[in-house]
Structure formats: C-alpha cells, structure tokens
Amino acid sequence: MSRLDRSRYAALYGPTVGDRIRLADTDLFIEVTEDRSRGPAGTGTGDEAVFGGGKVIRESMGQSLATRAEGAPDLVITGAVVLDHWGVVKADVGIRDGRIVALGKAGNPDTMDGVHPELVMGPGTEIIAGNGKILTAGAVDCHVHLICPQQVPEALGAGITTLIGGGTGPAEGTKATTVTPGSWNLARMLSALDDWPVNVVLLGKGNTVSDESMWEQLRAGAAGFKLHEDWGTTPAAIDACLRVADAAGVQVALHSDTLNEAGFVEDTLAAIAGRAIHAYHTEGAGGGHAPDIITVAAAGNVLPSSTNPTRPHTVNTLDEHLDMLMVCHHLNPSVPEDLAFAESRIRPSTIAAEDILHDLGAISMIGSDSQAMGRIGEVVLRTWQTAHVMKLRRGSLAGDDRADNTRARRYIAKYTICPAVAHGLDAEIGSVEPGKLADLVLYDPAFFGVRPSLVLKGGFIAWAAMGDANASIPTPQPVLPRPMWGAARGPAAASSLIFVAPAAIEDGLPGRLGLATPVVPVADVRRRGKADLPENTATPDIRVDPDTFTVTVDGEAIEADPVSELPMTQRYFLF
C-alpha cells in the first residue's frame, strides 16, 4: 500500500488529525481532533473528495449520478477545518437549500467507501475547495449602531453575517443609543435592510414605563429592546421594560446609568430582579455605572458582552477613548461636567480586568459598538488579539497542551453562538451544525480573523477576496474584499433572515411590509442565563474598590499591564 508522510498529505488534502494550525500571526494554535472527510474510522482514506483536473470529483468517480431531486447537495465545501464552539474537526460540509445538511465525507458511494448519505455529490453539486483552510460560522455582531449603510459591506468583509442593534442613520439618537424607535422608523429600517445579505435584529426603545409603546414597537418589527442611559435608564424603566420582555419572550440590552443619578449598580441589579438581560460593554468604558458596572458579570442572569475598542488593553486604549466619548455622547469638552462624565468612564483597572474576565469565560460576548466607540470591521480581529494576549499572560488554559483548542472554542463562541443564544437566534444561526443557515466564513490560516477568503450567506457566496475583474485569472492584484453574486438584491434577500418578536408575526407584519427577506420569530429567551452560553459560563466573585478602582476577581487583584505590541496589525494593514 502506498503511504504519504504527514506533510505531503497536508499539502494534497489539508491538515488531518494531530496536525496543528497557527491562527494568523498570533501565538495561538488549533489541532484537528477528528477527520470526517476520510469517512467513519478512516474508511475512505485515499479517495478524499478533491476537485480539479485529474482529481477525484469527476463523472462516475467522485461525482455520482444522483440528481437534486434524489437529495444531492447544492454545494460541498471539501476538506475544511471547522473551528466552532463544539470542537475542531476536518470535514466536507454539505449545503442544500441554503442550510447545512451534514459534516462528513462527500463523494460517490458507488465508487467510494464511507460517504455520508447526505453528501452524495451529483451533477448539480457545486464545489468550494476548503482543503487547507479554516471554516467558521458567520460572526454575529451583537452591538450595532446603524449609522450608515456602508457598515454592511465593512461587516461582510470582516466575516460578520448578522447585525443586532438599531438606528435610523446619523441621527443623534442613533449615534448614541442603538435604538430604532417607534413603528414608522422600524418599518423604514426593515425596508432599507431588505436588500442586504445580512441577518437583522432591530432593537426598539425600552426607556419608557408605557407598556403599550413597547408592544407597539414589537408588533412593528422590534426583536427586543435597548435601555440606554441617554434616554434615562432608571430602575422604573428597567423593570417596566423587563416586564414587557418577559411577556413577549424577547431580550433586553442594557446600557446603565454612568452618573449613578437614579441609583447605583446594586439598584440596577435589584430592578433587574434576577431576570435575563444582555449587559452591553460590561467593563464600563462604553457606559454604565461608574466605577463598578463590571461586577454584573458575576450574576448568572446577566449575559455580559464587551465592545471592541477596549479589546485588548493596549498602551493606546485610554488615549483614544476620551475623544470617542465626546463625539458619541454629544458632549462638550469645554463643559467641566461633560469632561468629568467622560473621564469617569475610562479606567485602566477595569479595562485590564476585562481581559482576564474574557479569558475566564465570565464576559461571554464581543460586539462592535459600530461608529459609536467601536469598529464594525474589527469584532473578529480584536477577539483573537485578546486571546493571544491572554495566552502570553496566563499561559495555556486547562485542557490545552500541544494546542489551544479550549481557548479557541471559548473565544469563537463570543461572536457566534453566545450572541445567538442570548437573542434567541440559535435555532437558525450561530454555529456550523446541520439544519442551520449556511452563514459561513472561509479563511486561509495565515489570514485567519483578519481577511476572509470567502463569506457565504445562506450557502451562496456573498463576499470574497477577489483580484482584478479584467484579469485573465481571479488572483491578480489588487486583491480586495468585494461583493459577489450573493450580495445582489435577489439572492441577498433569499439567503438572509429578519428576526422579529413573535408578536409581529401574529400581527401580520410580514404581509404588511411586503419584505423579500424571510421574517422569522426569535425564540423565547426569558429563561436563558449565562449557564446557557457555551464555553463562557463563569460567574466569579468580582469587586471594585470605590477609591482606587482596583478590581479583584475571586480575591485576586488585577494589575493593569497594557501591551505595546499585537499580532494581526501592521503585518496585514498599511493603515
């Protein structure tokens, strides 16, 4: 029997069990723990599905006679290393009707052993070569200010396929508060987003004690609420909003009271009263009770997230935040009270603790805060920069030895499955699993987390790193992230989802607005807690000294030690 050494096999088919892959230029490595592309127990080793001249996927060889009507997949991604919250495996990934059908071995069972019954390729099957590449779920940005439509291509180019947030454009309310308020604005924004290849979750305004005003927004397409201090996040407003959310089954995102005008963090937790809530920028630089909002990450009912400008803590983090705050919250640096408000939110001690809490899995999600103290194109990148810094500082996590699979699974969950679970989207998106929408991102390992090779939306290529369109082949420079056919109006809508409250479906919203994008209800999230967020369930004791702002986690004081150098930076970007 002919044999291949490990390096030759990897060159032909991609890495297999026991091979390690470096993530971009970080110090993080993942190791393949299972190779499903070789069939059960390796029964198909030697005839792995590979496309090209003289290769396997040809008529009566790797390609069978199966028609689409007989179940052949529409698309197979061959030999990709799937990195998800549940593991690191190599597999052929089959897609049909825009959804993942199986992870296994693709091929022709008439000529090949170990072919998965859902991955029998026929003449109607398209192929993407994932060999040697990393495949992840599309990112879910859980904190988006919809300030301008140009954010969408930036997001897609960074591997983001779902946007959770709100806004109406560059209005002062939107620039500050992630809210699409009222039925008229919701209808306009749903119509505007109908043509884009992204899934959408709009948040209505929760800062009111009027139940009917909140129900009106739910019937009009809001899939949850945002409570923001700029609209007045009082204990009464928190309680009223959560009462309606409990009845409607939707999530509430919280930006609490930085100035402690209506109460302190203890009062906010008392108003929440053990109910599920998504705490935005839990560290506090983005807003929230100063100086100790970070302590809410210890509560099991609080689903905590970060926004990316504080990820990770660097020597530049503090300096850029003051200017960002002034712009985003309509403050005047010549007014002493405005300056004090801004300075109260920027604390090196809590930013340093945020790093540690992410590595422990105590802060569970990362979003952007797009154009409102955050960058929509850097959610994925800054997540992995944080993981890199934490490995350097804290060493390998328990369970990691030759590679960093445990840490990688924890960090990828922060922008995929965890926000999907928090907002009731996980039945549809958030992971690479059969039955879910095929929102997938394919990376060359050297560019992992920096620049995707392909972004699939509902199983159709929407964005790609593409060379000169007038060239004779696809690869000549300049290679730029560009829209593909899946970003065109028809397939963009057909391949995406608009998530709304169940009340909107019951009220006939889809027919009333005439949207091309399928409209689906969010799942009831009111009984969900941090224990439901994969790989990010920790609830350590967190305390903040009110005088020095020193943070202790399970009794250990966290020292601020900002880094001066990061991976995934100048090696990849000119600016």
UniProtKB/Swiss-Prot annotation:
Keywords: Cytoplasm, Hydrolase, Metal-binding, Nickel
Catalytic activity as recorded in UniProt: urea + 2 H2O + H(+) = hydrogencarbonate + 2 NH4(+)
Annotated organism of origin: Frankia casuarinae (strain DSM 45818 / CECT 9043 / HFP020203 / CcI3)
Major subcellular site: cytoplasm
Residues annotated as the enzyme's active site: 329
Listed EC numbers: 3.5.1.5
Binding locations of Ni(2+) 1: 143, 145, 226, 369
Subunit structure: Heterotrimer of UreA (gamma), UreB (beta) and UreC (alpha) subunits. Three heterotrimers associate to form the active enzyme.
Positions of Ni(2+) 2 binding: 226, 255, 281
Domain Urease: 138-575
Full protein name: Urease subunit alpha
GO cellular component terms attached to this protein's record: cytoplasm
